[in-house]
Regions:
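Generic macromolecular interface patches on structured domains
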Residues: 81, 146, 189, 289-290, ...
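Short, low-order "capping/linker" segments at domain edges
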Residues: 250-258
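N-terminal Rossmann-like NAD(P) cofactor-binding subdomain of oxidoreductases
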Residues: 1-152
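N-terminal charge/polar-biased segments
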Residues: 1-7, 26, 272-297
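Active-site-lining helix/loop region of Rossmann-like oxidoreductase modules
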Residues: 9, 131-249, 263, 267-270, ...
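Sparse recognition of residues in long alpha-helices and their boundaries
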Residues: 62, 87, 195, 245, ...
């Protein structure tokens, strides 16, 4: 079966996990892992798996533009602000896993629509917390107007690499923005905590939602919408599940979800990284299928 070539910028934890997820993909062929340190473990790992390792950053892609049609950005928000312009000039589709938010926010279970895929050139995967919590907010906002949504994402310190730590301010701003734009909340707040517990905890997310009008009066509809959304997310993130049963009282809905990683490269406790890479793969697959259909026409 024909495949669409893709490259990954960023040879750290997220880039490495993406590469492992893509090695046996049915529609995507990972052709290059791009970093800035020839001695990095990520680039050495790429070579072992037969993936071209590029150590001079995005310049390596500029020198070899035919390497990929789709490019995953797994570096930092600052880096993508620079790289996005180059990718646009090269005519590459970009899937951004940083909080840069150059392109529109995308959460596969909420707003990845087949008919819109042809028009997507640069999409932003929000943040790990956004991928885990926005579907919950959206499920409730589809039933009742959401006046306010507050999310607390708690992740293991051991799963937070340099990129995550450098982007914490951007994480809170980008996640809160996307809760409004994609989740449908009027107002929002996002908080992230790093938990140093050993053994490491799974990613846990608590979502507090205040509705306009009585949520309790529509409890059945809300619970049904939540169950359907969780099942949707599980179609590409199998380890996504309720941590506790949702609570609906008066105008408040409280939902707790946890994410166990798939263990492709990262440990299973790193569900925070796994959910965003899985969402990015799902998005790339949709883009690739669209490109392959165009070729057949």
């Amino acid at each position: 079966m024909a495949k669409v070539k893709c490259a990954i910028i960023g040879s750290g934890n997220i880039g490495s996990d993406l590469m492992m997820k893509l090695l046996d993909n049915e529609v995507l062929e990972v052709t290059a892992l791009i970093g800035i340190d020839a001695e990095s473990e990520g680039l050495k790992r790429a070579e072992k798996h037969g993936v071209k390792a590029i150590s001079n950053g995005i310049d390596g892609l500029v020198e070899n533009p035919d390497l990929a049609d789709i490019v995953y950005e797994a570096t930092s928000a600052k880096a993508h602000l620079h790289n996005s312009k180059i990718l646009k000039d090269l005519g590459k589709k970009a899937i951004d896993l940083t909080p840069a938010a150059v392109g529109p926010f995308l959460v596969p279970s909420v707003n990845l629509k087949e008919e819109e895929v042809p028009h997507l050139d640069n999409v932003n995967m929000v943040t790990c917390g956004g991928q885990a919590t926005i579907p919950i907010v959206k499920a409730v906002s589809d039933v009742l107007k959401v006046d306010y949504a507050e999310i607390v994402a708690s992740i293991s310190s051991m799963s937070a690499g340099p990129g995550t730590r450098q982007n914490i301010d951007e994480f809170t701003v980008t996640t809160a923005n996307a809760i409004r734009e994609v989740g449908g909340a009027e107002k929002s707040k996002a908080i992230i905590t790093l938990n140093p517990a050993d053994p490491p905890i799974l990613m846990r997310n608590t979502i507090h939602i205040q509705t306009s009008g009585s949520a309790e009066a529509k409890k059945g509809e809300i619970l049904e919408a939540l169950d359907a959304m969780v099942e949707n997310v599980q179609s590409y993130v199998p380890g996504y599940r309720y941590k506790a049963e949702p609570v609906v009282k008066d105008d408040i809905v409280t939902v707790s979800v946890e994410v166990e990683g798939n263990g492709d490269f990262l440990p299973k406790y790193a569900g925070n990284l796994d959910i965003i890479t899985a969402a990015a793969v799902k998005t790339g697959e949709m883009m690739a299928k669209n490109l392959l259909e165009k070729e057949r026409v």
